[in-house]
């Protein structure tokens, strides 16, 4: 017994439609009846588990897919290598997996000609490899050279792609070329705005846009960071990281204004009040959704202690005080 192309296509369609429960049932059935030399069903099963955030089962399925594909002369399953690379915590092994996936993608692109989806996959892989050389493999002698190379390759595919521009900005920050990083981030925001306006498939994922926010804060583009965060919040207001970053952005901006002596006392106070509001809101979301990251909770609590120590009022307290002062002034005017 073997699995048919039609069965595999149905699983893929379920995945595209986010019907993961149905996809899981079909993928398990397909994997059970797949011959030893066919890893396609296991590759899809791995993708389903990855979508369900079951990393352990995803890794097992992808490894089985790789094992069954060893003797194939024309392996077309690049996804298993890219996914395994993403969840591999060994930089050198992750690099080899990415390169294997890219090799397959490049071959498929030659066979199929112009294919936007394949190009996007290759571009994403190039960005991931560049990130590896900025993180896990940063101590290698040729790390900076390779980072430049893969970032350049990604931008050659599409110079307006937000993920590629984000990678460029991240690299420039690591090189202390802040103005060049800001330029890349400005172009990145233009790309995001254009994709959002056109409701395009080129709109970066929520996670990518959140990473872009962190870079914006790092280079002190606070207004742009706030605007992007507000947009992300409108998409989903139950994401803890967004509330935390809204607060962190205000807090860091207030610190910068104080250190540089560029802001008025009122402006700094307002930023710190906003930061406190966002941090309190973040704790509310934390409790509501049962988030399991104790680290971010501890940091928020630490920041709130600092703000309380500075005597920063809650927003409702400030509003009540303002209303009381207004009422008192009105009474004095009436007496006059």
From Swiss-Prot:
Keywords: Chaperone, Cytoplasm, Nucleus, Repeat, Ribosome biogenesis, TPR repeat
TPR repeat coordinates: 39-72, 75-108, 110-143, 162-195
GO biological process annotation, one example: cytosolic large ribosomal subunit assembly
GO MF assignments: protein carrier chaperone
UniProt subcellular location: Cytoplasm; Nucleus; Nucleus, Nucleolus
Superkingdom of source: Eukaryota
GO cellular component: cytoplasm; nucleolus; nucleus
Pfam families documented for this protein: TPR_8
Stretches for region Disordered: 316-336
Role noted for this protein: Acts as a chaperone for the L4 ribosomal subunit encoded by rpl4A and rpl4B, required for hierarchical ribosome assembly. Shields ribosomal protein L4 until timely release and insertion into the pre-ribosome is possible, once ribosomal protein L18 is present.
Record-stated family: Belongs to the ACL4 family.
Record's protein name: Probable assembly chaperone of rpl4
